[in-house]
Amino acid sequence: MNGSGSTAKESLFNPTPRKLGLPEDNTMTPYNGVRSIFDNSSGSRQLTDEHTNQERAISKAKLADENIAPFLAKHIPSQYAPLGADASKTTGPPRPMNSRYCYRHRPDLKCRRQADEPSMDHLQWELQSLSQSDQQGIAHVWSLFSAAPAKQRELMLRGILAQCCFPQLSLISSSVRDLIRIDFITALPPEISFKILSYLDTASLCRAAQVSRAWKCLADDDVVWHRMCEQHIHRKCTKCGWGLPLLERKRLRASKEQIEKRALGVSVAPDSSTIAVQTVDATSGVKRTAEDLEGSDSQVVKRQRLPTEDTELHRTNVRPWKDVYKDRFKVGTNWKYGRCSVKVFKGHTNGVMCLQFEDNILATGSYDMTIKIWDMETGEELRTLTGHTSGIRCLQFDDTKLISGSIDRTLKVWNWRTGECISTYTGHLGGIIGLHFENSVLASGSIDNTVKIWNFEDKSTFLLRGHSDWVNAVRVDSASRTVLSASDDCTVKLWDLDSKQCIRTFQGHVGQVQQVIPLPKEFEFEEDHDAGHEEDSNASVSGDESPLRQEPCSPGASFFEGDRPAPPRYILTSALDSTIRLWETYSGRCLRTFFGHLEGVWALSADTLRIVSGAEDRMVKIWDPRTGKCERTFTGHSGPVTCVGLGDSCFVTGSEDCEVRIHSFKN
């Protein structure tokens, strides 16, 4: 048994006594072995052989320990140093982290993978069923493998696998299948885990939160759900096609910088100079506090792993973004399936011609010459503004003032909180049937076919002439210093306030245009090429034949030179030809026509997710602005629907039947 004729594989897995550190024993020959088995002549001889075998096993174990101990002490001195460690080798600077090891086997870290208790119990039971010598041999093999460096481990494993039969390979395959499943979310730094989780959809995130407490902490974090809110709220997600109703934009803006810093692994230290911005969620009324980082030198500090008292207090006052998303998702689902509650406000004695609402305040104007202020939650009429001598056709209000326009040719400015009329403006030769203000610029449209611009800062005014019939609606865009106007002459015009000239005319309607509204900048149109070509050809027949219309142009290129902002890219118009049209202002093209109303469309309101229209046919329709599909139709008014208002979780309609209806999708 000197092993000279054995292969390398045999010498690896069938070591001779010399390879284990044992001297060759001439008594261990085949002859002696056979003689010890078949010679039963003396019982004392058998006892002597048993005693010799025990001594030999003990001697083998001692010699194996003497050979294995230096190997273990060399590779894992911190865990196994029975011979004593050299103090001179332990002094000095700490060794740098070795990146060649995986996170399970780094020498400077303990294994963070928990042992499988049932498997270890079964392994221990099987080991104890073996003889003492077999237990020692197996323990030595485990110790050698545990202490071996990575390359030697791989060599050992390849050799073991080469000796395995198919049943053993099957056992290895079934065992490895579970062992290689790594909890990467917990093992990775939080910043990388946030990045991974941010690619999941809502259903997958909710499932991830059920895996473990560590996963729940990461999957429910504001970093992940703030990004989810940005993807879906007030816009259609390009991945899933879902869009959720708008909530206060301040909340997204104020929290965005803090959330982004947390996602990168840093946090913003609270500063006494920061301004706290509090907003109220439209669905539940729970306040969410966010720090406004503008104008403050916020100190960026290293991220704290343990929450402090300040952060805990902040968390108790801040509503999690997951809850915000959940509420918005419920509202969005109600919008999709038409689940809503209806409130009817009665108080006007003539047709309701205009309305606007903000938060829970609703203002309505009527042909009965009054403006009424309502509490939308309770339905209570807060006050009535009187002073006009004819029907009120248009109004708009903000936090401090309300401006109304009437057939009596006047504009009135009100303190709507007290009911006081602050001032009255005259200048039109006919009744005022449309108005809109933004910042310090007010535009009004009149029966006298003109648009008048009022500047509150320098008190200047001027007229825009070009329409040949009543101007029914106007919209100011103060950023680009432009105004849109819709008229009974079947056209829509875009005006430059600096040059006081019309820079584009949109033609295509065959009935009087009643409304024009710009779509938010966040709106992105997905053009259907077949439908788009059809709309282009139809619009070009009756549209403006100027070169500006036919040439494709980049945003703002055909309007202004330099860095001046361009006007809104997309606008919506409605007319008494029973249609709604979507236009691109840069090219002048009509991108889509919405068909469905049976009679003229009087009222129009829209955001990035939907369009609401009211018509002479007494119906209110909800449209998808991207596809042109009518998603739902609401009835209930007994007269033409003359005005509509759209919010994140409700829409309001007014009619010539003197009623105001609120459709709420909150519950």
From Swiss-Prot:
WD repeats lie at residues 347-386, 388-426, 428-464, 466-507, 549-593, 594-633, 636-667. SMART domains: FBOX, WD40. InterPro entries: F-box-like_dom_sf, F-box_dom, G-protein_beta_WD-40_rep, SCF_subunit_WD-repeat, WD40/YVTN_repeat-like_dom_sf, WD40_repeat_CS, WD40_repeat_dom_sf, WD40_rpt. Disulfide bonds: none annotated. The keyword Mitochondrion does not apply. It holds the Pfam family F-box-like. Residues 1-55, 528-562 are annotated as: Disordered. SUPFAM superfamilies: F-box domain (SSF81383), WD40 repeat-like (SSF50978). One of its GO terms (biological process) is protein ubiquitination. Component of the SCF(sconB) E3 ubiquitin ligase complex involved in the regulation of sulfur metabolite repression, probably by mediating the inactivation or degradation of the metR transcription factor. Belongs to the WD repeat MET30/SCONB/SCON-2 family. Component of the SCF(sconB) E3 ubiquitin ligase complex. This is Probable E3 ubiquitin ligase complex SCF subunit sconB. It comes from Talaromyces stipitatus (strain ATCC 10500 / CBS 375.48 / QM 6759 / NRRL 1006) (Penicillium stipitatum).
